[in-house]
Amino acid sequence: MHAVSMTIIGAGSYGTALAIVLARNGHHVLLWGYNPQHIRELQEYRCNQAFLPDVQFPDNLCPEDSLETAIKASRNILIAVPSHVFHQVLYNIRPYLDQHSRIIWATKGLEHGTGRLLQEVAREILGDKIPLAVFSGPTFAKELAIGLPTAITIAASDTEFSEELQQLFHFDKSFRVYKNSDMIGVQLGGAVKNVIAIGAGISDGMGFGANARIALITRGLAEISRLGIAMGAELSTFMGMTGLGDLVLTCTDNQSRNRRFGMLLGQGVDIEEAKKQIDQIVEGYLNTKEVHMLAQRIRVEMPITEQIYHVLYCGKSVSEAANALLSRQLKDEMYDTVRF
């Protein structure tokens, strides 16, 4: 019998925030991170001084430095790590899983180097029998941790699992959880919105104003939807929390690292200096390459993503990228929706 309701792998800002929410909801939670010194600090100070210094841990949130202990303590394993290490984390935890284990992830992105959905990665490494679920939606870790009202979406490989997770996380005072059966759409929305957010930041950094920002968000949503439909997702998913909701949040609020990174580029800061100034992982920078790779592989037109890719990886200037988008052939607004 597992004694812990949830083990969370990843003691960054988002993993910590999710652990706090679960613990406040009365559940016993273990929080594991790869850096033993960081875990010792969490244990000593009972808060995450590096990322959420003003939020104290509930008594039933326990930082744990042993991966084996953390995994074996609960059947529910939630992974909240950057997308480029997701693959390795699955390999690391696999020896400690048992026949009752279930995997959830809050990682937003595609597999580094392949552009595969994280669901595909999990199935390849863990097999077909283990239940899978993904968390996504418009959430900033700080607001989640301090208890401001937040809504999120869960998509799982079976209905019973998603309903159980919905009940586990739902907190009447501040945290509302929706179900969605479309795992593909939920994953893609969370991955591609970071790329579009860099574009929104570039636009604002260049001083293009509110009109341009909203046009970019709207056409970005069209790109996400077009890619999703080609991958087998439901169009309605992109009108919800993990599509429109997460996209608008990430493109318009300066808590978003992706938006801030783009703003620096738009102001003329070079890529390496912009990454240095953000001083945390910019998922959109990593995922632009993977999203571009995926779009080319399945032959889906994504002009905003393409121009951001050229800026980040091919040396194109932000002004050249903006001109390329503005000078594209005129289109019917719905051309890219009805073609599927």
Curated annotation (Swiss-Prot):
Binding site residues for sn-glycerol 3-phosphate: 108, 137, 139, 193, 246, 256-258
Pathway entry: Membrane lipid metabolism; glycerophospholipid metabolism
One GO term describing the cellular component: cytosol
Catalysed reactions listed for this entry: sn-glycerol 3-phosphate + NAD(+) = dihydroxyacetone phosphate + NADH + H(+); sn-glycerol 3-phosphate + NADP(+) = dihydroxyacetone phosphate + NADPH + H(+)
A Gene Ontology BP annotation from the UniProt entry: glycerol-3-phosphate biosynthetic process
Entry keyword annotation includes ATP-binding: no
EC top class, as a word: oxidoreductase
GO molecular function terms listed in the Swiss-Prot or TrEMBL record: glycerol-3-phosphate dehydrogenase [NAD(P)+] activity; NAD binding
Keyword NAD: yes
Subcellular localization(s) per the UniProt record: Cytoplasm
Family recorded in the similarity comment: Belongs to the NAD-dependent glycerol-3-phosphate dehydrogenase family.
Protein name stated in the entry: Glycerol-3-phosphate dehydrogenase [NAD(P)+]
